[in-house]
Amino acid sequence: MKLNHIPVLPKEVLKYLNVKSSGIYVDATLGGGGHSELILEKLKKGFLYAFDQDIFAIKQSKKLFANNHKIELIHSNFFFLKQELNKRGVFFVDGIIFDLGLSSFQIDDKERGFSYLSNEFLDMRMDREQKLTAHYIINNYSFEKLRNIFFNFGQEKNSSLIAAEIIKKRPLNTTFELVEIADKFNYNRKGHSSKKIFQALRIEVNKELELLQKTLHQCLSLLKEGSSIVVISFHSLEDRLVKNFFRANSIINLPTKLPIVSNFKTVLKIITKKVVKPSLEEIAFNHRSRSAKLRAAVKN
């Protein structure tokens, strides 16, 4: 299987990242290497550190960037971004990009269990070396834990019914077994309950929201003044987290009764007045970009 490295919102990423030819940049989610490729084209004396917890992405990108000496590929979850950079003597960077979507190769890989459209083993691990899988969650978590995961991470209204049916039908081994249960309670609503359940499981397996929140905080101390952080999300939970994080760090929140200091600066300045979405032309060219939402901010 080859990587599909068509980057989402390529022009917008370059616009808001504002790549300097001699800058130090971080691609926190290497994936198919599309955004890394865009950044590298702008670098002359600069350098790029690209992270991915999926070893397949790292191995394939080694081939893609085999002759490029301006990039280092790091097999690691972005949660360890600051630690890994500091180990390399890097304490400040000129920009960071996150593309939080599943890569095409992960969706298409029949052994990963990310897609509800094909019958696969319930895995859903980004990092194949970690122990926790969707299979373990489905077959071992309590009713309460399953219900809460489906409701909180999938925003599924019928989370209780689906969780109860899973407990009743255990053991479940494949994606289609789970799809059959989830869609049983769809009740003619638009869209698939399966999509919500699979999203919820993937978030739980990979601790996506928890690690994203912690990593965004790390980025504040890594960014130089005037440097950008760009985040592309693909569902409302991620987008809300990023939106709230940017807002919280872009407002002045001084204690009451203290004198106002005229030169007080916020940590971030939001540079996307509203969320940026792909054009109709991009969606027609790259269908998987359709739910992408980009937000960007600059370090003050």
Swiss-Prot record:
Localization per Swiss-Prot or TrEMBL: Cytoplasm
Gene Ontology molecular functions: rRNA (cytosine-N4-)-methyltransferase activity
Pfam families cross-referenced by the UniProt entry: Methyltransf_5 (PF01795)
Domain of life: Bacteria
Subcellular location, principal: cytoplasm
Root EC class: transferase
Reaction catalysed by this enzyme: cytidine(1402) in 16S rRNA + S-adenosyl-L-methionine = N(4)-methylcytidine(1402) in 16S rRNA + S-adenosyl-L-homocysteine + H(+)
GO BP terms, alphabetized: rRNA base methylation
Binding site for S-adenosyl-L-methionine: G33, G34, H35, D52, D99, Q106
Cellular component annotations (GO), alphabetically ordered: cytoplasm
InterPro entries assigned: RsmH, SAM-dep_MeTrfase_MraW_recog, SAM-dependent_MTases_sf
Xref: Gene3D superfamilies: Putative methyltransferase TM0872, insert domain, Vaccinia Virus protein VP39
Keyword tags: Cytoplasm, Methyltransferase, rRNA processing, S-adenosyl-L-methionine, Transferase
EC number(s) stated in the UniProt entry for this protein: 2.1.1.199
UniProt key word NAD: no
HAMAP family referenced in this protein's UniProt entry, alphabetically: 16SrRNA_methyltr_H
Similarity-based family: Belongs to the methyltransferase superfamily. RsmH family.
Function (record text): Specifically methylates the N4 position of cytidine in position 1402 (C1402) of 16S rRNA.
Protein's name according to its UniProt entry: Ribosomal RNA small subunit methyltransferase H
Lineage: Bacteria, Bacillati, Mycoplasmatota, Mollicutes, Acholeplasmatales
